Curated annotation (Swiss-Prot):
It comes from the Archaea. This is Isoleucine--tRNA ligase. Belongs to the class-I aminoacyl-tRNA synthetase family. IleS type 2 subfamily. A motif ('HIGH' region) lies at residues 49-59. One of its GO terms (cellular component) is cytoplasm. Gene3D superfamilies: 3.30.720.200, HUPs, Isoleucyl-tRNA Synthetase, Domain 1. It comes from Methanothermobacter thermautotrophicus (strain ATCC 29096 / DSM 1053 / JCM 10044 / NBRC 100330 / Delta H). InterPro entries: aa-tRNA-synth_I_CS, aa-tRNA-synth_Ia, Anticodon_Ile_ABEc, Ile-tRNA-ligase, Ile-tRNA-ligase_type2, M/V/L/I-tRNA-synth_anticd-bd, Rossmann-like_a/b/a_fold, tRNAsynth_Ia_anticodon-bd. It is an enzyme of class 6 (ligase). Catalyzes the attachment of isoleucine to tRNA(Ile). As IleRS can inadvertently accommodate and process structurally similar amino acids such as valine, to avoid such errors it has two additional distinct tRNA(Ile)-dependent editing activities. One activity is designated as 'pretransfer' editing and involves the hydrolysis of activated Val-AMP. The other activity is designated 'posttransfer' editing and involves deacylation of mischarged Val-tRNA(Ile).
């Protein structure tokens, strides 16, 4: 089917619905994959989003960047792997399901619901949300293997995770140990550092007296009174100066540097000691009455380099059961680890009086007890950064518990070496942010005391504590002596029922009840998605991955977990190139949240503007690694660009369909192209070249901005303006065919270049424009190879046209100054410049300037010869020097030839005035030059020169001007009747005899421009009549469609 005239308006929803139906009905995505099956492979790994709800704007941005880049790589000739991933385990989904089931604690889950039912509900929830989110991504036009995703709850995937843990065990990198870890009392589970969000929080700030003897106390500051029941020591810095400071009848031991800050100027220093001298000093626990176990423990001062003077007293409360640093220093001193707090954050019986209280609720009781005992110096509050559980937003606590760890500290150096193999965009993301995170990495707490997750594949002997790490489902089946798997279902509680026989003592081995940290789930995606090691073919073909991209929070998340797991399992980093992108924020730079009411849903944007506009906007708004402020006004600008593109497409198809243009009927070699044709062909290929480079470098903002500027400035505002008159001439005119051929080639290259960013509208244009003109072309635009004709690029021509456009803008400004309409021709225009490049550009493109400036003649020169130069004295320099003689100099200068004065200054550096027998030598500082143009000449400057136009209205000029004014009114009336472009009309005009005589010589021009079969000045009313005023002339114009 030949090219058809496009719909007049850009209707994104209709286009996108039609295109997505076309893709689905013709199985285009699968056919694109088949087309490039034998091409070089390009491997991509999708960072899996959680299946815990609907997508948000940030998720959309993430997938749009991925889809854009992968569509581009496919069109560049690569066989691209684009399997989507889904993160389905862990607290994000458990929390949602708890809400649906109306449970609030682990006890409720186990007693009221049951683990099996809870796990099943979690799986159902994940599956339902996966389906919803898949539909949302597809609505955005994202092409991925949606029917073959990797899903972290699939047994084959989980098996790869088990194998990774077995590898860690084989390398002695898996250990169970008692350590202080971050803990969520609401979720009743351990948390990794990556699972903690930090916010400002208000807490108590108290100064506590730890009794030494008599009225002497060690003064300690803390913001966690609830940890005092676990206090075992006070740490001081060995190198700091400490003071015994007396105030109000009591003596306080504290850092000398902080005495005045804490105790005030009244405090008297009795003596000074080094921190080392305080080591071993014993004290009585301030809560030994309330927590009786402390009566049996000797508490003393220890030394620690972690003590600082930035806050507090320089004497640090040390509770090995509640602080990582406290725990480590406690091991050094052999301190007992007391942690009288259970999984829910409730004090146990060991806490004495506080038993049964939630730890944070006990703060006030503890402070009150200290006050009543006279052991509270002062109390207040402090606002500081504090950790919160990433899912339930509960403040974390530190607990000493037995957990499973991966010994990251032992492979840290290898991880840093592997990091050097990765290319980061931007470079600083890997070189500073990520490297710093790894350098400060601690061992990884991988066990979670939850239900919906990959069960830790560790079986422990009930008799001798030996462990066995299972690496596959088949291995588990072979080793099982009790219990049976239901198919390959290895979630809790089914896997908990499997008992093994201990290889050491023959005892019963039961699985540790914990599940894995979800960051392990996604961390093994690089090989688990390929079902390695149970299958090896896909792994050999696609591993390692050429490209991944996620948000900047993943430097401590997925980027990190993949690197750690990759080094453990495979001794290498799983990815070779990383784009770290930003977050989406509201217009004011705030995080989007329901509480602020500033959330923008992707569906809302699509409903208003369509998916392509949203895609392009998110890529265009800013650099991908910066946070994106969503601004509706900017979105409207992008929508405007798409409407402009569509209008150009409508323009092209309207005239091409009318003339039944087929590019294959005319060889480019046989056509005579104008300079503007060669220029736009050069521009589109320059743009395609820059877009190619930008996308390769993951600079989507540069790519989209190049396209935006080309569509708006070069194609619509300039080239279409240049060729519009050529589309009105006879059908087979070579000049017209050259314009058609050029516009067709430009649009074809443009939609290919734009298609990765805006696949729907480009597909729609392709199906009509390209498939209509070239029926044998591939069925979808995405089956095309990337178009780039570097041979068409003419940098000099582009530079010259830039100059010409500046000249035309200057001409418009000069006309504005003279209030001289653009439709009215001018007799002559002179381009003046001292820059040879400007003059050459104006000469080489003189025809373009003449047509666009509507000038009869174009001249170029280094100066405007008719400009009069007037020389005047400068009072600022001459006044103090000449005083009463200034009038003499003024008279002589104003009577002199200004050009001669200027020439003398330029050659000699001075000009001499002789008058009334006096001589005055003047320099360039003494003379001010003004210019005066002849009558009817107006001027305007541009970067590189000036233009001068002659606005004299000769009879010939007036004739053309009035004819153009008449044409404009008739064209407006054609639009009112919504006539087809090719429709002929009859025109009748009622006007004065003078106007008729003025415009009669332009009859042929008028008839051609408005497609009039007849033009009569003997007025008779036709079908559509309208009154007009042109200058001082009142006209009546009547038109009707001509009979065919």
């Amino acid at each position: 089917m030949p090219i058809q005239e496009a719909e007049k308006s850009y209707r994104p929803h209709r286009i996108e619905e039609k295109v997505q139906s076309f893709w689905e009905e013709r199985d285009i995505y699968e056919r694109v994959k088949e087309l490039r099956e034998d091409r070089p492979r390009y491997s991509f790994l999708d960072g899996p989003p959680y299946c815990s709800g609907r997508i948000h704007l940030g998720t959309a941005w993430n997938k749009i960047m991925k889809d854009t880049y992968l569509r581009f790589k496919s069109m560049k000739g690569f066989n691209v792997r684009r399997q989507p991933g889904w993160d389905t385990h862990g607290l994000p989904i458990e929390h949602k399901v708890e809400g649906l089931l109306g449970v609030r604690s682990k006890k409720d889950i186990e007693d009221k619901i049951g683990i099996e039912e809870f796990v099943n509900k979690c799986r159902e929830f994940a599956v339902e949300n996966k389906a919803v989110m898949t539909g949302q991504f597809q609505r955005l036009g994202v092409w991925m293997d949606w029917d073959d995703p990797y899903v972290t709850f699939d047994p084959a995937y989980m098996e790869s995770c088990w194998w990774t843990l077995k590898r860690a065990h084989e390398k002695d990198l898996l250990v169970r140990d008692l350590r202080v870890i971050t803990w969520c009392p609401r979720c009743e589970t351990a948390l990794a550092l990556a699972e903690i969000d930090y916010h400002d929080k208000e807490d108590p700030s108290i100064y506590v007296k730890f009794p030494v003897s008599g009225d002497t106390h060690i003064l300690v500051w803390t913001t966690t009174p609830w940890t005092l029941p676990a206090n075992m020591a006070v740490a001081v810095h060995p190198d700091f100066e400490y003071a015994y400071a007396r105030l109000d009848g009591e003596t306080y031991i504290m850092a000398e540097a902080l005495v005045e800050k804490v105790l005030g100027e009244e405090a008297e220093i009795l003596k000074r000691v080094k921190g080392t001298e305080l080591e071993g000093l014993t004290y009585r626990h301030p809560l030994d009455d309330e927590v009786p176990l402390h009566r049996e423990i000797e508490h003393r001062v220890i030394l620690g380099d972690h003590v600082t003077l930035t806050e507090g007293t320089g004497c640090v409360h040390t509770a090995p059961g509640h602080g990582p640093e406290d725990f480590e220093i406690g091991k050094k001193y052999g301190l007992e680890v007391i942690c009288p707090v259970d999984e829910a954050g409730i004090f146990t019986e060991e806490a004495g009086k506080y038993s049964g209280r939630f730890v944070k609720d006990a703060d006030e009781d503890i402070i009150a007890d200290l006050r009543s005992k006279g052991l509270l110096l002062k109390a207040g509050t402090i606002s500081h950064r504090y950790g919160f559980c990433w899912r339930c937003k509960t403040p974390i606590i530190y607990l000493a518990t037995e957990q499973w760890f991966l010994k990251i500290t032992e492979i840290k150096d290898k991880m840093l070496r592997e990091l050097d193999r990765v290319q980061w965009v931007p470079s600083w993301a890997g070189e500073s942010r990520f490297r710093n995170w790894i350098e400060n990495a601690r061992d990884w707490t991988i066990s979670r005391q939850r239900y919906w997750g990959i069960p830790i594949p560790i079986w422990i002997c009930e008799e001798c504590d030996s462990i066995h790490v299972v690496g596959s489902i088949d291995e588990l089946r072979e080793l099982a002596v009790e219990g049976e798997l239901e198919g390959d279902f290895i979630h809790r509680p089914h896997v908990d029922r499997i008992v093994l026989e201990c290889g050491e003592c023959g005892g019963r081995m039961k699985r540790t009840p914990d599940v894995l940290d979800v960051w392990i789930d996604s961390g093994v995606a690089g090989w688990a998605a390929l079902h390695y090691p149970s299958e090896t073919e896909l792994f050999r073909e696609w591993f390692p991955y050429d490209f991944i991209t996620e948000g900047h929070d993943q430097t401590r998340g997925w980027f990190y977990s993949q690197l750690g797991c990759g080094v453990i399992a495979l001794d290498e980093v799983p990815y070779r190139r990383v784009l770290m992108h930003g977050f989406t924020l509201d217009e004011e730079g705030r995080k989007m949240s329901k509480s602020l009411g500033n959330v923008v849903e992707p569906e809302d944007v699509i409903e208003k503007y369509g998916a392509d506009v949203l895609r392009f906007y998110l890529l265009w708004e800013n650099k991908p690694w910066e946070d994106l402020k969503f601004v509706w006004d900017e979105l409207r600008n992008v929508n405007k660009m798409f409407n402009i593109l569509w209008n150009v497409y409508v323009f092209a198809t309207t005239y091409m369909s009318l003339d039944r243009f087929q590019p294959g009927d005319h060889s480019a070699e046989d056509l005579s192209f104008r300079d503007e044709d060669r220029w736009i062909l050069s521009r589109i290929n320059s743009v395609a070249l820059k877009v190619t480079e930008a996308i390769e470098n993951l600079h989507f903002h540069r790519a989209t901005r190049e396209i935006h500027d080309f569509i708006v400035e070069d194609l619509s505002r300039w080239y279409i303006r240049l060729i519009r008159s050529r589309t009105w001439i006879e059908r087979d005119d070579p000049d017209k065919l050259a314009a058609y051929h050029t516009l067709y080639t430009v649009l074809k290259t443009l939609i290919v270049t734009l298609s990765p960013m805006a696949p729907h509208v480009c597909e729609d244009i392709y199906q009509n424009l390209v498939r209509g003109a070239e029926p044998d072309s591939p069925e979808s635009i995405h089956m095309l190879d990337w178009i780039l004709d570097e041979g068409a690029v003419d940098s000099q021509l582009e530079a010259d046209m830039d100059i010409v456009r500046e000249i035309i803008e200057a001409c418009a400004r000069a006309r504005d100054t003279a209030r001289y309409k653009l439709r009215w021709p001018v007799r002559e225009m002179v381009v003046v410049s001292e820059d040879e490049g400007v003059l050459k550009a104006a000469e080489s493109l003189k025809n373009v300037i003449a047509e666009q400036a509507n000038a009869k003649s174009i001249k170029t020169s280094t100066e405007f010869p008719d400009m009069k130069i007037i020389a005047r004295p400068n009072p600022a320099t001459l006044g103090p020097r000449l005083r009463q003689d200034i009038p003499l100099v003024m008279r002589e200068l104003e009577g002199a030839d200004g050009s001669a004065v200027k020439a003398a200054l330029d050659s000699d550096g001075e000009f001499t005035v002789e008058t009334d027998g006096k001589k005055f030598k003047l320099t360039s500082e003494d003379i001010v030059f003004e210019t005066e143009l002849p009558e009817n000449i107006v001027s305007a400057q541009f970067d590189g020169g000036s233009v001068f136009i002659d606005t004299e209205l000769t009879p010939e000029i007036m004739s053309e001007a009035m004819a153009r004014e008449l044409v404009r009114r008739i064209q407006d009336m054609r639009k009112d009747l919504d006539l087809d472009v090719e429709a002929s009309i009859e025109v009748s005009v009622k006007c004065s005899e003078e106007f008729r005589e003025l415009t009669e010589p332009q009859r042929e021009f008028i008839e051609n421009e408005v497609r009039a079969s007849t033009l009569s000045f003997d007025y008779s009313e036709l079908e559509y009549t309208k009154e007009w005023k042109i200058s001082d002339e009142n006209l009546i114009i009547s038109i009707k469609p001509a009979k065919v």
